[in-house]
Amino acid sequence: MRYDYFHYTERDRKFYEEHLKDRMPREFIDAHTHINLPEHIADVPGERIRDDWALQNGMHMTAEDAAYYYDTLFPDQKWSLTAFPYPIREVHMEANNDYVSRCADTGEIAYGLMCIKPEYSVEYLEQELTEKNFSGVKPYPDMVSGKKGADIGIFQFMPHSHLALVEKMGLPVVMHLPRAGRMPDDAN
């Protein structure tokens, strides 16, 4: 489902040619892309979307749609994606993770990260990371709180056992820090 508001115009092309084309690297990787299918986000309440500017700016994007957008916006560049589900509690996470893994299998994305929930057992997590095409994990505070900047600690949404497993497997963790102060917060 491409967004109705996305229209690439002659003005856009001209701006790209005059201001961006020669400044852009020939190859780049977007290391933070959310992909999903409509059924993965069907249960996200409308009020949740209205209360969060990020959710209002495009909750749904398939890997195919992402390719269309990137090809349109960056016609002279070779691009690749690191992608993962939208990491909020109401998403059908297991199905969305499967979709991300399949997209990595087919080469639609370069790297897929598994969005993890704190309640996942270490055994389940290890099985998924071993048997499916995931290059790392994406824990997120929303899996505990449902609120941005919530006053929770890192190990509430990424238990020590999960961290130990991904360290053992040598996998990266892409993490948004919790708490309103983010990086400078002493509890982080």
Model-derived features: positions:
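An N-terminally biased module of ancient metal coordination in phosphate/nucleic-acid-related enzymes
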Residues: 1-86, 91-92, 130
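Histidine/acidic-residue-rich catalytic or RNA/ligand-binding cores of hydrolases
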Residues: 39-42, 184-188
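Active-site gating/metal-coordination segments in enzymes
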Residues: 2-12, 80, 88-181
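Well-ordered, non-membrane alpha-helical segments in soluble/globular domains
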Residues: 55-70, 93-102, 155-160, 185-188
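Solvent-exposed, non-transmembrane amphipathic alpha-helical segments
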Residues: 48-55, 101, 120, 149, ...
